[in-house]
Amino acid sequence: MRPIRYLLLTLSCLLPLALSAQRTRPDILVQIYVKGLRTDLLDSYRAGWGGNGLNGVMKQGTVAPDIRYPYPLLDEVARLASLSAGAMPEIHGVYQAERYDAVTQRSESTFANRDYRGINSTEQLAPAGALRSELLTDVLRGSSQGDAIVYAIASRANDAIAVAGHDAEGAIWIDKHSGWWATTNFYGGLPALALKANNEQRMLGGRTTPTVWKPLSKSTKEGSFAHTFEGAWRMSDLLTSPFANDAITDLSKEFIRYAHKARRTSPTLIVMVLDLEVGARGVAYADYSPEQQDAYARLNEQVHQITALLQELYGADHYALNIVGVPVANLAQPKAPSRRSVVTFDPAKCIALANLYLSAIYGRNDWVMAYSHQTLHLNKKEIADKKVDMQDMSNNLATFVSEMEGVIGAIPAYQLQRGLSQPAWAKPLYSHSYRSYAGDVLLALAPFAEVAGEKPGVEQQRQRHVTAPFILMAPGVASQRLTEPISYDAVAPSLAYLLCVPQPMSADGTPLFILFNQK
C-alpha cells in the first residue's frame, strides 16, 4: 500500500504542474516590428497613457529590455531579416537596405530584381536572389501546406519584403511617390483588401489622411504644434509622420477581420512594420520633442486598436501579440550646440588620392571606382585584365586610407570573410563583407565624423547603441519583466514554438522557454 500511496501523492503533486504546462496555440499572431522604438523612451512616455494599449500588453505579457546581437548591425533591414530568420546576414544574405552595383555604378535596393515588376510602384523588387534563408512566414505557410494566412505590411518596400520572405501571401507597402498600396508581382497580384483600400482612397495621402499633424492629446504639457503636408516634400513628410503608421494599422485591421471570417484551421500571421523615426524634410525631430512624444502616444493608440479588435474577434485565449523594437537612423539628425570638433570624411577626395597612390604602384588607372556605405569598391575588371594581385591591392589601399581624416581604420573585406584576427573597430563592419557587391575595403569612421554629401549625423546615430524592447502577450505566456537582454536568434524560434511549427531552418537558437513558465 505504501508504494501506491507514494505514487498517488507524486501524481497529485505533478498534476498542477502538468495543467500549468498546457498551452493553447493562438489562432492568430500579430507581430509588430517598430523601428525606432526605444526602451528608455517607452518607459518615460508611457507613465501617462493609462491601462490600455502598450501598458496593458506589457502588464499581461513578458517584456525584455533589449535584444542582443553577436556583433553590431547598423542597418534596420538587416535587423528585420535577422530577427525573422533567426540568423545573421552572412547566412540570410541581407546586410543592408541598399547595395552598390559595380556594373551600373549606383546604389539600388538590396531586393532589386529585373525579373519582376512592381504593382503601383516603379520599383522592380523580389526576395529571390537576395534573401537566402527561410523566415517564420515561410515556415508557417509551408507547414500548413499553404493554408495559413500570412501577410506583411510596411511603409517601405525593403521592410515589407525583409519580413515577408518568399512564401507569404503578400508583402504590401506604401509607394513613396503616390502613397498607394503597392507590391511586386513576385507575390502575385495586389491583395484584394489593399486594392479596395486604394479604390476607396484609404491609403497614405488619401481621404482618410489628415492634412495637418497636430498632437493627439489635447493636453499642452508636451507642447503644441501644427505641421501641414504640401509641396514637393508632401509625400516624403507623410512617410515620416505617424500617419503612415495609421495607414498600416488600418489595413492590418482589415486583414485581421478577413482572417477571422476565413476560419482556417492553421494560425494566421500578420506582420506589421511601423516607424517611430518621425521628421520633416529629411531631418528627424529631436528626442523628447513634442512630435516624438506624439508619435509614441499614437503608437500606443495603434496598439490599443489592434488589441481591442483581436479581443473582440478572437477572445483573450486565442490571439497573440508580439512587439519588437528595431533601432533605426535614416533621417539626418537635428543640429545641436556642441564644443566637440567634428571631422569630415570626403569620399571624392579619398578616391582621387587613393587612385594616385595605387597608380604609383600598379600603373596609372582608376583603380578605385566608388564609395558607398563605408566601403570602397575596386575596379575588378581592370585588376583582372592587368593581372594585378587583388589582395595585395586591397591591403595597400586599406593601409593608405587608414591615414585619412575621419577614418579610424580600414580593412580588406577578405580578411573579415576569412575570420582573420581583427581589431575591435572592425566589428561593426563584419556584416558588410559577405557579398560580392559589398565592396573591397571597409572603413571605420571616427565617432564624430561626417561624410561629405550625406545626411549629417546618420552614421553616428547608427553606431550608437540603444535599447530596443521585446514584448510578447499570448495565451500561456507569463506576465513578467526580464532584467537581461534576450538573444536575437531566440525571437523566431520562440514564436515558432508558440505557433507549434518548426523554427526556420537557419535558426540555430532555441525558444525562450522562460516565456512560457506560468506562475
Question: Across the structure, where does each feature detected by a protein language model lie?
Answer:
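Bacterial N-terminal signal peptides
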Residues: L8-P16
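Beta-strand elements within well-structured catalytic alpha/beta cores of enzymes
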Residues: P26-T39, V57, L83, L140, ...
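A long, amphipathic alpha-helix that forms part
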Residues: W49, L238-R264, E277-Y319
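Short, solvent-exposed turn/loop segments enriched in Gly/Ser/Thr/Pro and often Arg
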Residues: A64-S84, Y151-A160, V273-D275, G325, ...
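His/Asp/Glu-rich, glycine-adjacent segments
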Residues: A87-S266, D275-G282, E403-G406
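Substrate-binding rim/cap in mid-to-C-terminal beta-strand-loop elements of soluble/periplasmic
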Residues: I351-Q391, G457-L499, F513-K519
